[in-house]
Amino acid sequence: MMKRVHVYVKGKVQGVFFRAHTRKAALRFHVNGWVRNLPNGRVEAVFEGRSPEVNALIDWCRQGPSHAIVEHLDVCEETYTGEFDDFRILYDERAS
């Protein structure tokens, strides 16, 4: 079963290479989508892939890389679209 989630990560998640490590984890789990920093200090991401792999990436985000401190993780399931063929780091607020 395919799955899509929209994720917001709160805590010490900027300046600790959270986006780069999320991309590496997504590639390892064969999950597509994107990740970006938000001006309010959170990290936002969209993950698409097979349900077990997306769930594994969500679990990874609960901990994050070694220097991150994840205080809260919001996960919202969305309708799977299959629109992504890779996993990207976005560097502005446009997710298109």
Swiss-Prot record:
The active site is at 19, 37. Residues 4-91 form the Acylphosphatase-like domain. The gene is acyP. It is an enzyme of class 3 (hydrolase). NCBIfam families: PRK14438.1 (NF011011), PRK14444.1 (NF011016). Its EC number is 3.6.1.7. Keywords: Hydrolase. Gene3D superfamilies: 3.30.70.100. GO terms for molecular function: acylphosphatase activity. PROSITE patterns: ACYLPHOSPHATASE_1, ACYLPHOSPHATASE_2, ACYLPHOSPHATASE_3. The keyword Cell wall biogenesis/degradation does not apply. The keyword Hydrolase applies. It comes from Syntrophus aciditrophicus (strain SB). It comes from the Bacteria. The lineage of its organism: Bacteria, Pseudomonadati, Thermodesulfobacteriota, Syntrophia, Syntrophales. This is Acylphosphatase. Belongs to the acylphosphatase family. It catalyses: an acyl phosphate + H2O = a carboxylate + phosphate + H(+). InterPro entries: Acylphosphatase, Acylphosphatase-like_dom, Acylphosphatase-like_dom_sf, Acylphosphatase_CS.
